[in-house]
Amino acid sequence: MASRPLPPGRQEEENAKDSGRKPSPVRPRGCLPSIDEARPAGPGPAPASRRGSMLGLAASFSRRNSLVGPGAGPGGQRPSLGPVPPLGSRVSFSGLPLAPARWVAPSYRTEPVPGERWEAARAQRALEAALAAGLHDACYSSDEAARLVRELCEQVHVRLRELSPPRYKLVCSVVLGPRAGQGVHVVSRALWDVARDGLASVSYTNTSLFAVATVHGLYCE
């Protein structure tokens, strides 16, 4: 009786048994062999894989090493492009050093000395003189009003600082407007100590404008 021909897969198994080697798996047509199948049997260096090639690149080509280089600062930070301020100095957002803070020695007092209290009547006279000197020939202009108000506040602050006792903080505000027959009410409110703090307010008018200046003298310890 004639033997039937074996299928291709069975024929390879029989041939592998005869030769004593491991049979190769049967793959469908159009499929490539895997890494284990393509790797040669026996000892020898393993072929370079994609993962190994990526890990084997030089460290100098990585983005992390480009940021953390020889010129990096502590903690891997890149140095600033601007000038480095001295250690312990304060710097503003513009990069310029700030003015040193004003320091006053503590007196361990919670109220002023009886002879060093803020006098509202004396401040009132100085405030009237400051407004008369700064506005006697002034004409109202919307473009120059802001500059004129700043100058008046500076003049009032200089005059009253010379008359105020130590440890008093002065808060000055000036309201300026055109004189056109309108009615204006200027009101100010403050949280203060009636026994130690004070207030002076003066209004001034000429043919073109009106002004209301208010100064609060607050005892600051």
Curated annotation (Swiss-Prot):
Any single Pfam family the record assigns to this protein? Tctex-1
Query: By what name is this protein known?
Result: Dynein light chain Tctex-type 4
Q: Where is this region: Disordered?
A: 1-52, 65-87
Keywords attached to this Swiss-Prot or TrEMBL record, sorted alphabetically, are: Cell projection, Cilium, Cytoplasm, Cytoplasmic vesicle, Cytoskeleton, Flagellum, Nucleus, Phosphoprotein
| Phylogenetic classification of the source organism | Eukaryota, Metazoa, Chordata, Craniata, Vertebrata
Alphabetized GO MF terms: dynein intermediate chain binding; protein phosphatase 1 binding
User: Sorted alphabetically, which InterPro entries does this protein's record hold?
Assistant: Tctex-1-like, Tctex-1-like_sf
Q: Where is the composition biased (Basic and acidic residues)?
A: 10-21
The annotated subunit structure for this chain is: Interacts with ENG/endoglin, TGFBR2 and TGFBR3. Interacts with PPP1CC.
Tissue specificity is: Ubiquitously expressed. Expressed in testis (at protein level).
Q: Which organism is it from?
A: Homo sapiens (Human)
